From Swiss-Prot:
Keywords: Acetylation, Phosphoprotein, Proteasome. This is 26S proteasome regulatory subunit RPN8. The keyword Cell wall biogenesis/degradation does not apply. Pfam families: JAB, MitMem_reg. It comes from Saccharomyces cerevisiae (strain ATCC 204508 / S288c) (Baker's yeast). The modification Phosphoserine is found at S314, S317, S319. N-acetylated by NAT1. Acts as a regulatory subunit of the 26S proteasome which is involved in the ATP-dependent degradation of ubiquitinated proteins. Residues 301-338 are annotated as: Disordered. Present with 19800 molecules/cell in log phase SD medium. Belongs to the peptidase M67A family.
Length: 338
């Protein structure tokens, strides 16, 4: 691979197109759907901006048996060039949810259509958990530690979702339709926090399972992955206190510095949490005071309405009695004449 790619950005249109493709071709066997992705792969960041579906068939029992229409790929690619010449064929996608045995062979086929190493994008159309429903891979030659011949394997690339302004507006409208309008801001934040914690728990579980398989020699040692995990662990703050038997004279100064850093981090965290607590408390008191004021105002308005209604009734009764008194002498005169 002449160009070293670092990450992949995916437009929401690609996810919607892949989901629509799967829904239209869904069968009882729940076979995966395959398509082509378009975009730009001439920098360290691969940008996936568009896609189109492909006719695809495969034998579930035999991974070597599959069908892909080459003429359809070429014709659709030429049509897409006429619409947007900047979008190049950079790889392919399928509905996963995991890698298949035939993916390497299909990936080799797409090399004839791409300028660089083709990108494989897996879109999980039935994702139940939290996190992005996408995984991106590029094929590389893996060098083994035992000195044997290299073999082709997939390298995972981090993914993010990025949208243009028009796409952001469309996504906001979609979210507005599916969002529960009755839910308050606090409940939405708590729900998002819960989903984030569940996602973190799932990722940590995957890390533990991977390390267990490496220890049990079910998977080969990958120094790149272990180095990434070590970098993650190094970013975590060390808030633990050393045991008494771990303290000696040589590293006593270093432990004191570590303890000071731990204390400073703890104090700063507690101060920030205290500010958040006081702010929420003040906000709640103000809201409660506004509620009381609204209750008082509503009661005054209700009392005023009752007084107005009573005064109106009394005025009507007085006017009726005045009319009766004015008409009484006339009635008496008529009676005398008769």
């Amino acid at each position: 691979m002449s160009l070293q790619h670092e990450k992949v950005t995916i437009a929401p249109l690609v996810l919607l197109s892949a989901l629509d493709h799967y829904e239209r071709t869904q069968t009882k066997e729940n076979k995966r759907c395959v398509g082509v992705i378009l975009g730009d792969a001439n920098s360290s960041t691969i940008r996936v901006t568009n896609s189109f579906a492909l006719p695809f068939e495969e034998d579930e029992k035999n991974s070597d048996v599959w069908f892909l229409d080459h003429n359809y790929i070429e014709n659709m690619n030429e049509m897409c060039k006429k619409i947007n010449a900047k979008e190049k064929l950079i790889g392919w996608y399928h509905s996963g949810p995991k890698l298949r045995a035939s993916d390497l062979k299909i990936n080799e086929l797409f090399k004839k259509y791409t300028q660089n190493n083709p990108l494989l994008l897996i879109v999980d159309v039935k994702q139940q958990g939290v996190g992005l429903p996408t995984d991106a891979y590029v094929a590389i030659e893996q060098v083994k530690d035992d000195g044997t011949s290299t073999e082709k394997t997939f390298l995972h690339l981090p993914c993010t979702i990025e949208a243009e302004e028009a796409e952001e507006i469309g996504v906001e409208h979609l979210l507005r339709d599916v969002r529960d309008q009755a839910a308050g801001g606090l409940s939405i934040r708590l729900t998002n926090q819960l989903k984030s914690l569940k996602g973190l728990q799932s990722k940590l579980k995957d890390v533990v399972e991977y390390l267990d398989k490496v220890i049990n020699k079910e998977l080969p040692i990958n120094h790149t992955i272990l180095g990434k995990l070590q970098d993650v662990f190094n970013l975590l703050p060390n808030l633990g206190t050393p045991d008494d038997d771990e303290i000696d004279v040589e590293n006593h100064d270093r432990i004191n510095i570590s303890n000071n850093l731990q204390k400073a981090l703890t104090v700063k965290t507690n101060d920030e949490l205290m500010v958040i607590y006081i702010s929420n408390l003040v906000r709640s008191i103000i809201a409660f005071d506004d509620l009381i004021e609204n209750k008082i105002q509503n009661k005054k308005i209700q009392e005023q309405r009752v007084k107005d209604k009573q005064s109106k009734v009394s005025d009507d009764s007085e006017s009726e009695s005045g009319d009766k008194e004015a008409t009484a002498p006339l009635i008496q005169r008529k009676n005398k004449k008769n």
